[in-house]
Amino acid sequence: MNLKHHKTIIIAWISLFLIVSACDTPKSTRPSRQVVTHSNEVPKLPEKMIFFNQSLSLLDIDIKERLDREILVNTYFQSSTSLAIKRSARYFPTLERILKEEGVPEDFKYLCVIESNLSNVISPAGAAGFWQFMPGTAPEYGLKVTPEIDERNHLEKSTRAACKLIKSNYRLFNDWVNACAAYNRGPGGLLRDMESQGVKHFFDTEMNPETARYVFRIMALKLIMEHPTAYGYHIPSETRYSPIESKEIQINMPIKNLALWARQQGTSLKIIHLLNPWILTNQLSLNAIPCAVKVPANKHVLGVFKK
């Protein structure tokens, strides 16, 4: 057998070994065969859209191009927009219910998306929660902010507080778009801007860069999140974050050790803080009660991890 033929046989055996080894690899360690593709195509904007229960024309060049910018920015900010779509399945039902009860247009739920991306974040300026209340403003709308609890992170209470603020703006401007812009600019600031320019609506007012984009960002997220596949987001319902089943326990006495109390309920301090992000510490003192604390609805929901 010549050397060349010998090498050929060795190479063939090595190739066969690699193929067999690959076939024996457990599925859990194989790379996914799913192919992720991104398209550079952006759908044509509609001629009009329903926004805050009103038909809004998008034929105006300035309005159209400012909205188009925010569509592009958010369409290609895939990680953030994908998270918003996933989180919306968990939080939108609560937001929609409260907005309806408070008589505020449902589209204001998208304000939460641009403010916090549906998470309890703290801004560099100190604003917190889904609705990004400042610590000095929160108590004016009934939210407690102490070293122990921060109700800006309480989804239900902060949403009702936001509704009070939005409705206050609406009473001043008699227009939901202006009320929305005032959420960012402040009602006094928006009034001064309009009066100095002799106009009465946000779309006719020259604003600071942040507020100038604010309403259009909400409009863009509404279009994208209502029609995700049209903008290249293919997120199956089973991959979205479903609401966490919980029940409330009324607390009328101080709890010195919340971790111990949590274990007595069959859960943990970590889960208590997950379900109640407004609780900041390991206790509930007299200043925090009475209050309702959420716990998992049953042992199959967020139970204690065990190996």
Language-model region placement:
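Catalytic cores of secreted or luminal carbohydrate-active enzymes
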Residues: 209-232
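Catalytic and binding regions of secreted/periplasmic enzymes and modules that target cell-wall glycans
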Residues: 166-193
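Substrate-binding/active-site groove segments that recognize
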Residues: 126-147, 159-161, 166, 190-193
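Solvent-exposed, acidic/flexible segments
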Residues: 77, 81-92, 101-104, 123-131, ...
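Primarily a LysM-type cell-wall glycan-binding module
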Residues: 237-266
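An acidic, Gly/Ser/Thr/Pro-rich helix-cap/linker signature
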Residues: 5-103
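Short, functionally critical alpha-helical segments immediately adjacent to catalytic or ligand/cofactor-binding
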Residues: 104-119, 179-185, 272-275
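Extracellular LysM carbohydrate-binding repeats and other cell-envelope/extracellular binding modules
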Residues: 271-307
